[in-house]
Amino acid sequence: YLNMALSKGAAGCLCAAAPETLLPEKFYIAVEDTERALGDLAGWYRRKFAIPVVQVTGSAGKTTTKEMLAAVLGQHFNTLKTLANYNNFIGTPQTLFRLEQGHEAAVIETGMDHFGQIARMGEMVQPTVAVITNVGDAHIGNLDGTRQGVLRAKSEIFAHLAPDGLAVLNGDDPLLNTLALPFK
């Protein structure tokens, strides 16, 4: 895929192993973990923008919530949003790399299926607003087999919430009502 991307105009690439053929006038950066490096680069890029950023997570309703928030914000602000439901370690950086100087707000959807993933995406996103739609059974088998495990994983969204940030929780969700905010 590297040579295809480079031949279509990419200036360079991050790679865990050097390709057999190096194309002229392209750059190659060797990294141990390409996914980690992509996320670190996206986080660095996001920090160049002093705009409100909403990070949305939850067991269900993430995409609908993201679309509604972006539609409302878009009435008054030039708002970037996650495309479709590209809410993983590849899609989140791709969204952040679409930030431009004219953007005034962003709504970033983040999904997960293991502990640590929402915190990692929050490290990239650096949210000023954190939204948890609900806590359900999605991926429960990877999260201690309990909804409390799912709650703990979703609560990772607060790890990188701005100190003066806002948490928005679904008041109808019984587990979200057990959280004591500010969350530490």
What feature does the model see in each segment?
Residues 1-40:
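N-terminal leader/targeting and accessory segments in enzymes
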Residues 36-171, 175-183:
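Phosphate-binding loop of NTP-binding sites
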